[in-house]
Regions:
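H-loop (His-switch) and adjacent beta-strand-loop-beta switch element
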Residues: 210-222
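N-terminal Sec/SRP start-transfer signal
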Residues: 238-273
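ABC-family P-loop ATPase nucleotide-binding domain
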Residues: 1-10, 219-249
Length: 275
């Protein structure tokens, strides 16, 4: 269970202070599809970023399965993001010169998993999103909907407890948007999915719960959850696990990147010489 307790967040620019979130409290079930709905500037993306550990709250607490994050170090936050959270954004953030399989495998490189196991799990994740026959394609050879499916597979390959989606259909046509939403609905059967959207129709059609934000305050919640506080233990601090890739893995990735760029440069030079 994820608990958001009286979280406040401000952004300061010179003398200007913007209240992004104001005493936001929310309890989220382990498996539900929550849509965070609201206009631009309502605080919904800030809330999503705080849940994902991409941004820090000023006050309050974020409690994950009874673990308080108040005393989290940078390393704890890194490990939390890598082991607990899967991210899906409007932009797919795929590496263009890597194959689809390699893009998904990349999410596992910091976990110390063997190459064979990475390949097996990445293949499994791509099969789960309907791309089992596209493993060796590059992003440039795929449609927008297919690339978003790759991004979802990459988010799921670590088997995270929570999947966060920020406007996942924003760059897609209506037909492809429906396919992606159906996939997210399926994913939410056995984990928590939190999606930020401007689109009330998508939220009402696919989400099991809609939380509406405006001016940094929760205005409505279609299915609030109040756990039995008598059965909950007091939140504690706990150090997270490994959050960085090995030196060998870093060098391998760098070498592959340089090799690809070198090949491109040679091909360009050759084409220019005969052109």
């Amino acid at each position: 269970m994820l608990q958001i307790k009286q979280i406040c967040k401000q952004y300061k620019t010179g003398d200007l202070v913007q209240n992004a979130l104001n005493n936001v409290s929310l309890n989220l079930r382990d498996n539900e599809f929550v849509a965070i709905l609201g206009p631009s500037g309502s605080g919904k993306t800030t809330l999503l970023n705080i849940i994902g550990g991409l941004d820090r709250y000023d006050s309050g607490d974020l409690i994950i399965n009874g673990i308080s994050t108040k005393k989290y170090t940078d390393r704890d936050w890194d490990s939390y993001r890598n082991h607990t959270i899967g991210f899906v954004f409007q932009s797919y953030n795929l590496i263009p010169h890597q194959t689809v399989l390699a893009n998904v495998e990349l999410a596992l490189t910091i976990s110390g998993i063997s190459g064979a196991e990475r390949r097996r799990r990445a293949t499994e994740a791509l099969e789960e999103v309907g791309l089992g026959n596209q493993l060796h394609k590059h992003p440039s050879e795929m449609s927008g909907g297919q690339m978003q499916r790759v991004a979802i597979a990459r988010a799921l390959v670590n088997n995270p407890d929570i999947l966060l989606a920020d406007e996942p259909t924003g760059a897609l046509d209506s037909e492809t948007s429906i396919q992606v939403m159906e996939l997210l609905k399926e994913v939410a059967r056995d984990r928590l999915v939190v999606m930020v959207t401007h689109n009330p129709e998508l939220a009402e059609r696919y989400a099991t719960r809609i939380v509406t934000l405006k001016d940094g305050v929760i205005r409505s919640d279609t299915m609030p959850y109040e756990p039995d506080t008598q059965t909950l233990a007091a939140p504690v601090h706990k150090n997270m696990g490994r959050s960085s890739m090995s030196v060998l893995t870093s060098l391998t990735l760098s070498f592959n990147n340089l090799r690809t760029k070198k090949a491109r440069t040679l091909l360009t030079a050759f084409a220019g010489s005969i052109g």
